[in-house]
């Protein structure tokens, strides 16, 4: 599935806009990870465990969005975006969304 952040795809003619598609996931941090991150905050540097967690969440959200687009019969997703929000003290939601389209044959 072709996914792009642009509103169109060079060399392709959009036939039909099928609608908005999205995928989301909520991930909770581990208490031990939070403690280690607090220590890392004091000395500085990348919080690798959080980076890995967010990377996995982005991939899961994107995979779910692509599945939704495939279920609609889409050829691609344009105007792709991510959004992240904190929904609890130790949990974050990642949403991937865009517009599912069909190409002219």
Please place each PLM-identified region on the residue numbering.
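Short, well-ordered alpha-helical segments
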Residues: 21, 26, 34-81
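Short, solvent-exposed loop/turn elements at beta->coil junctions and helix N-caps
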Residues: 6-9, 82-87
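N-terminal presequence-like segments and the immediate start of the first folded domain
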Residues: 1-33, 71-75, 92-105
